[in-house]
């Protein structure tokens, strides 16, 4: 039987304002989350520390310097693989993605 262990991957660069809202919604879906801090400023970094600590499903990875969204996603995928997740869905930190569609994406990934 194939194991399906999805994770949400959120690259973050100085966009901490809606992270708690994203984590609340993804938590209601029982979806683990990897936040990748892509060299954010101190204010954002502190906010991410608090957010990750207050959401049990969230893990925080911090990159030493900004490498861009692609580098943050790749770093997050390596972390996801090391944590034995089988699938990742990337979600933008600014809240622009429709989180109502996440379950549809996960259902499609699980059945294909």
Which residues does each predicted region cover?
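Short beta-strand/loop segment that forms part of the nucleotide-sugar
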Residues: 31-40, 61-63, 91
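A conserved acidic beta->alpha catalytic loop
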Residues: 37-48, 95
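Short, well-formed alpha-helical segments that are part of the catalytic scaffolds
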Residues: 14-28
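Short beta-strand-to-loop acidic/aromatic patch adjacent to the donor-nucleotide binding site
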Residues: 85-96
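Cell-envelope/extracellular polymer assembly enzymes that use nucleotide-activated donors
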Residues: 5-7, 32
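Conserved donor NDP-sugar-binding/catalytic core segment of glycosyltransferases
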Residues: 103-112
């Amino acid at each position: 039987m194939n194991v399906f262990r999805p994770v949400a991957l959120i690259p973050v660069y100085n966009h901490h304002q809606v992270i708690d809202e994203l984590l609340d919604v993804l938590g209601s879906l029982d979806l683990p989350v990897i936040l990748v801090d892509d060299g954010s400023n101190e204010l954002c970094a502190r906010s991410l520390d608090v957010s990750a600590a207050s959401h049990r499903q969230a893990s925080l990875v911090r990159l030493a310097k900004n490498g861009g969204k692609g580098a943050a996603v790749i770093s997050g995928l390596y972390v996801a693989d090391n944590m034995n997740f089988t699938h990742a869905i990337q979600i933008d930190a600014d809240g622009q993605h429709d989180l109502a569609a996440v379950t549809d994406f996960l259902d499609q990934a699980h059945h294909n």
